């Protein structure tokens, strides 16, 4: 039996839930508006500015009563507060100071020298490209008997002193672009060539289809037989084009 005659129970429950939600929404809106219209923050904000004004009037009255006693304290505070910005300026100057360039003496086998200017963040490769453009692959740099072979290493990581000597060896022939293979190893194929195996697989599949067509002729209508013949002709032409001498 329905709660209300002529109206289903589902409709009654739905309207009841909507009514409850409406009541809750109205209650929340009423509490929100009352909190936003609370006059307490305004009164606290108006009372706080009164304190500095009272303090200023008290200071002015003290100055009027004893002007001679206040002036020494002001003179004493002025110079003590002045060196603070100077300390900040001196503390901020070291990060802004630029790094000094490195002066390098490049000494060749014939005892001739060449002065190069570089920065600590420059790499060995950039130094070669700058001083020997187009011949950086032929140049070898040696420092204190150690070959500087890593072109990505920076000059700052070597801790080079100013006006240090780097021995340069310039070879007459360009080195191979790829490292040579170790003895006893021969370069083999890079991988399995799938293209060379595709045609034999297709031929094997074609032979299997022709075998099924001969053994099970009723399952192959005329259209399937003609398609198989055309596929055979196309594959034969492809094989002839690939393996033609």
Curated annotation (Swiss-Prot):
Residues 34-51 have a biased composition (Polar residues). Keywords: Cell membrane, Cytoplasm, Cytoskeleton, Endosome, Membrane, Nucleus, Phosphoprotein, Postsynaptic cell membrane, Synapse, Transmembrane, Transmembrane helix. CDD domains: Ubl_TMUB1. Pfam families: ubiquitin. It comes from the Eukaryota. Induction: Up-regulated in regenerating liver. The keyword Phosphoprotein applies. PROSITE patterns: UBIQUITIN_2 (PS50053). GO terms for biological process: ERAD pathway; postsynaptic neurotransmitter receptor internalization. Disulfide bonds: none annotated. The keyword Phosphoprotein applies. The chain crosses the membrane at residues 11-31, 194-214, 219-239. Residues 34-100 are annotated as: Disordered. It is a multi-pass membrane protein. Its main location: membrane. GO terms for cellular component: centrosome; nucleolus; postsynaptic membrane; postsynaptic recycling endosome membrane. The modification Phosphoserine is found at residues 73, 97, 126. Residues 102-175 form the Ubiquitin-like domain. Residues 2-30 are annotated as: Required to release iHOPS from membranes. It is found in: Membrane; Postsynaptic cell membrane; Recycling endosome; Cytoplasm. Interacts with EEF1A1, GRIA2, GRIP1. Interacts with CAMLG, TUBG1. Interacts with NPM1 and CDKN2A; TMUB1 can enhance interaction between NPM1 and CDKN2A and is proposed to bridge the proteins; proposed to be mediated by iHOPS. Interacts with ERLIN2 and AMFR; TMUB1 promotes the interaction of ERLIN2 with AMFR. Involved in sterol-regulated ubiquitination and degradation of HMG-CoA reductase HMGCR. Involved in positive regulation of AMPA-selective glutamate receptor GRIA2 recycling to the cell surface. Acts as a negative regulator of hepatocyte growth during regeneration. This is Transmembrane and ubiquitin-like domain-containing protein 1. It comes from Rattus norvegicus. The gene is Tmub1.
């Amino acid at each position: 039996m329905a709660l209300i005659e002529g109206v289903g129970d589902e409709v009654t429950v739905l309207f009841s839930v909507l009514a409850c939600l409406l009541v809750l929404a109205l209650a929340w809106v009423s509490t929100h508006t009352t909190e936003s219209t609370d006059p307490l923050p305004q009164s606290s904000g108006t009372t706080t500015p009164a304190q500095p004004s009272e303090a200023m009037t008290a200071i002015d009255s003290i100055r009027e009563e004893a002007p001679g006693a206040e002036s020494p304290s002001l003179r004493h505070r002025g110079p003590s507060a002045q060196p603070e910005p100077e300390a900040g300026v001196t503390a901020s100057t070291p990060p802004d100071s630029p790094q000094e360039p490195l002066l390098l003496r490049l000494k060749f086998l014939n005892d001739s020298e060449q002065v190069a200017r570089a920065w600590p963040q420059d790499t060995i490769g950039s130094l070669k490209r700058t001083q020997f453009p187009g011949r950086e692959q032929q140049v070898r740099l040696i420092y204190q008997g150690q070959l500087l072979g890593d072109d990505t290493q920076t000059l700052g990581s070597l801790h080079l002193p100013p006006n240090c000597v780097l021995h340069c060896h310039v070879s007459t022939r360009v080195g191979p672009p790829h490292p040579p293979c170790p003895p006893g190893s021969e370069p083999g194929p890079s991988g399995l060539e799938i293209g060379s195996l595709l045609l034999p697989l297709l031929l094997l599949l074609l032979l299997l289809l022709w075998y099924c067509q001969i053994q099970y002729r009723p399952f192959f209508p005329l259209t399937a037989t003609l398609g198989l013949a055309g596929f055979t002709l196309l594959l034969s032409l492809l094989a002839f084009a690939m393996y033609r001498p």
